[in-house]
Amino acid sequence: LMPIVINKREIVTKDVYMKESTKLLEEVVVSAGRFEQKLSDVTVSMDVVKSGDIARQAPTDISSTLRTLPGVDIVDKQPSMRGGSGWTYGVGARSQILVDGMSTLNPKTGEINWNTVPLENVEQVEVIKGASSVLYGSSALNGIINIRTARPGLTPKTRFSAYVGVYGDAENDEYQWSDKSFWKEDKYAVKPILRGSLLSGVRNPIYEGFDLSHSRCIGNFDVSGGINLFTDEGYREQGYNKRFRMGGSLTYHQPDMGMKLLNYGFNVDFLSNQYGDFFIWRSPTEVYKPSPFTN
């Protein structure tokens, strides 16, 4: 701005127009030391995946995104970091999975069910590759995956995404287990909406789903919620997955009165999951069909 000179008993009017400027601040993480730190100050090997990067991949669950990170593998649906063991019967996981700092591992078996992770409301994923048992217990021997859910901003925000996919042909014609007549029999355990309309003539299995989330501030309250619906016929016969998940949170921020502030809130989650799987196939030429002895 140019200097403004005002003489005695003189009134000067000056119009000032301001424009919006956006500046990306340093990323802040909490997993490395259980408190907020700048990513540049963290001394351990750490990757951060933002919600925009996840949305561009259109994954059906968060494990599809994690397997793209260097040093992270998903073996038998369980995470493994830098070649370490993932999950072992009777021992449990060696990579801790957290959602907002709370463990999501099954308390009995120590494994992760990716269907429980609210993909529709993820803000960022923090991945620490390396032992962190001192802070997070024995399950964090190989590393930590901390999934942070989104918090309401200054303006209400609604996100919606829909996706559909078709599995390719089997690598060998002998392995192909489905055709158009198979789906017309209408005897399969799950049936996507598009199977009965737009994709009724497709012989291969399909999957479809949508995510919806909304967040806003109402006075001193933060309100957020999300819904996910996913149907997958599976690339193997009877390897289907049908999922309905919804959840929400309500947080109250105590007004600032010159004292330390406390936040009060609660979360509600609901999951309905119908799925099928097998690990013994029928024959060497029918590897995508379950053995009759597994029923």
Model-inferred region functions:
Residues 210-216, 248-252:
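Residues on the lipid-exposed face of transmembrane beta-strands in outer-membrane beta-barrel proteins
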Residues 46, 63-102, 106, 123:
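Extracytoplasmic beta-strand/coil segments of soluble accessory domains associated
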Residues 102-129, 148-150, 176-181:
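Short acidic/polar hinge/loop motifs at secondary-structure boundaries
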Residues 160-166, 225-229, 266-272:
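Transmembrane beta-barrel strands of outer-membrane/channel proteins
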Residues 7-55:
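Short, acidic, small-residue-rich periplasmic hinge/interaction motif at the N-terminus
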Residues 93-95, 154-160, 208-210, 219-223, ...:
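Outer-envelope beta-barrel architecture signal
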Residues 232-247, 251-295:
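Flexible loop and strand-edge segments within Gram-negative outer membrane beta-barrel domains
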Residues 152-214, 234-236:
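Short strand-turn segments of transmembrane beta-barrel domains in outer membranes
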